[in-house]
């Protein structure tokens, strides 16, 4: 059961049934420190393949086993339908939130975007 993402190469299932691309995405998510975030596109950029939509697809299918609330839209918003749960995690971890009109319901990307320091390859 291999799949393709547009013009992206075909990703094969590994021995535990997880596509290689998904395994790579989740491996990065596992490294994001508490209180920090990455946008979907940031993860694709680190991997050098796919794009925000492909990373989002992986997160929607396989992300429940990782710290999914640390992977957000470039605007600082949580995944659709998970805003309240993400907000609770962000507050618990001390993630920097935008003040003002959105009443802290959006991450301050300038302050909370992880720079990848210490990321394993």
Model-derived regions: residue spans:
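Nucleic acid-binding interface residues in structured DNA/RNA-binding domains
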Residues: 2-121
């Amino acid at each position: 059961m291999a799949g393709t993402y547009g013009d992206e190469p075909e990703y094969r299932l590994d021995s535990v049934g997880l596509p290689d691309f998904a395994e790579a995405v989740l491996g990065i998510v596992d490294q994001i420190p508490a209180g920090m975030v990455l946008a979907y596109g940031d993860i694709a950029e680190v991997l050098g393949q796919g794009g925000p939509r492909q990373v989002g697809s992986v997160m929607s299918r396989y992300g429940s086993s990782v710290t999914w609330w640390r992977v957000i839209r470039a605007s600082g918003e949580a995944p659709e339908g998970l805003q309240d749960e993400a907000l609770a995690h962000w507050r618990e971890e001390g993630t920097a939130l935008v003040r003002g009109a959105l009443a802290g319901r959006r991450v301050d990307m300038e302050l909370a975007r992880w720079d990848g320091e210490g990321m394993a390859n």
